[in-house]
Each structure stands twice: as structure tokens, then as C-alpha cells.
């Protein structure tokens, strides 16, 4: 910590990232001395949104650097899933971002444009709810609904993995302003509904979860939604 003091004295404008180190360095004193912190050692795994939601209770979102590792081979659903996960904090882009198709670049730019509109909610808002029914992260099956509120505006991040069921979020008194998703969705009667997947997952049950068979893709569904009080 004394070394950090010397570094900041020598370079007052330096931006310091605190390496997560498995969570060992996420403590108030050190976090008060750095600009940002890797939210976790999780890098490309499907569990990132669930880990990020848990860590949001410990690290302020304005300091929580969340990986969005984007690959050219990823489906559009996987790309949206990764970007929406990173919207719980400071987006850290990685992967094949300099070598992607025009269509994939456009999808990423759309997500970053949405994030620019809600980043004040991310940084300064209060967590309104984290509803996650996934019981085993290493073979996740289920969905998570993350809500953050700032004034009259509400950010809703939905992640569904392997579970093909529709996801419904009651939001009485709100109206939608913008969405970032590749899934079909509706907002009727004060209920946000992410449509059911068209696929059925294939895998084997493991510790209250579902592991895909070798060569079988996971079913990724996600969306970021901005609402305001009506």
C-alpha cells in the first residue's frame, strides 16, 4: 500500500487497476486507492454475469471492470450475452475486436451505444433487485434478472442460460425507452417478457445444473432494457 502511495504521488493522473487475484485484493483500503478492479479472474466463461452480479454487492460498479471477451466465431446471442454481462460495471473489451465482420462490429457498436445511454445508472444507481435461480455455476441452467435504479430510470439486465423458458419481469408503473437484445420481447400489462428459446438444450444433469454434450452449443439469451417511470 505504501508503494501505491508513492506511485500516485509520482504520477497523479495514473489510472490503476487492482488485479482481482481471486478476490484476495478486494478490500476497502486497497479499493480506495485504485481507479478500478478486475471483477474476477473469470474471462471467457458463461458464468460471468452471475459472478458479476454477486461482486456488484462488494465492488462499486464505477470501479468494477468486467470482461467482455468477444470472438468472431460467437453467435450474435453469445455476443449480446457477453456485452450485457459487462454492463454491470465498466466494460472491458477483449478478444477478436480488431478482426470481425461488419455485422458483428455493428452489433457491438449498438451495445456500446446503449451502454453510453445508461452508464450513469450503472455508476451511480442503486441495485433494485438481483433475482437468480441458478443453483450451480459450473453447469448453469436458469436465468438471472438484475435491476438498477437511478431516479425515474431503471436498467434491467436479463441473462438466461440453457433454460429455454420465457423470462417475465413485472415492472408496473414503468415504460420502455430502449432495448439491446437479439431476442424477441414484449412489454404488455406492465410485464417485460423475453420470449422462450426456439431450441431445446441437449446435455446431462450435473449438480443441479446442465452440462452440454461435446460439440453442443449452449443456449445463450440476454437483453439490456432501459425503462422510466410512466
Model-derived segments and spans:
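Glycan-recognition surfaces
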Residues: 1-99
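Generic hydrophobic alpha-helical scaffold/packing signal
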Residues: 4-8, 109-112, 157
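Short, Gly/Pro- and small/polar-rich lid/capping loops
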Residues: 8, 131-133, 220
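A glycine-rich phosphate-binding loop feature that marks nucleotide/adenosyl-phosphate handling sites
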Residues: 17-26, 101-105, 129-137
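Catalytic cores of secreted or luminal carbohydrate-active enzymes
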Residues: 80-131
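Short secondary-structure junctions
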Residues: 125-129, 133-135, 176-182
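Carbohydrate-binding surface patches
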Residues: 136-175
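C-terminal beta-sandwich/jelly-roll accessory domains of carbohydrate-active enzymes
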Residues: 162-230
Amino acid at each position: 500500500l505504501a508503494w501505491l502511495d508513492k506511485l500516485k504521488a509520482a504520477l497523479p493522473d495514473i489510472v490503476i487497476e487492482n488485479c482481482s487475484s481471486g478476490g484476495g485484493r478486494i478490500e476497502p483500503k486497497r479499493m480506495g486507492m485504485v481507479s478500478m478492479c478486475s471483477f474476477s479472474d473469470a474471462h471467457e466463461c458463461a458464468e460471468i454475469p452471475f459472478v458479476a452480479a454477486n461482486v456488484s454487492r462488494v465492488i462499486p460498479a464505477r470501479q468494477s471492470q468486467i470482461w467482455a471477451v468477444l470472438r468472431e466465431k460467437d453467435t450474435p446471442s453469445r455476443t449480446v450475452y457477453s456485452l450485457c454481462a459487462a454492463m454491470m460495471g465498466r466494460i472491458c473489451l477483449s478478444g477478436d475486436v480488431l478482426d470481425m465482420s461488419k455485422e458483428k462490429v455493428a452489433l457491438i457498436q449498438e451495445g456500446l451505444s446503449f451502454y453510453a445511454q445508461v452508464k450513469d445508472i450503472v455508476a451511480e444507481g442503486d441495485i433494485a433487485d438481483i433475482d437468480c435461480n441458478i443453483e450451480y455455476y459450473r453447469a448453469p441452467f436458469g436465468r438471472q434478472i438484475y435491476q438498477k435504479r437511478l431516479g425515474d430510470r431503471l436498467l434491467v439486465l436479463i441473462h438466461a442460460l440453457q433454460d429455454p423458458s420465457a423470462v417475465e419481469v413485472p415492472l408496473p408503473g414503468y415504460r420502455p425507452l430502449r432495448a439491446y437484445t437479439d431476442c424477441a420481447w414484449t412489454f404488455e400489462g406492465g410485464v417485460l417478457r423475453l420470449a422462450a428459446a426456439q431450441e431445446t438444450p441437449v446435455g446431462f444433469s450435473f449438480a443441479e445444473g446442465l452440462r452440454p454434450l461435446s460439440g453442443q452449443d449452449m443456449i445463450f439469451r440476454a437483453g439490456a432494457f432501459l425503462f422510466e417511470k410512466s
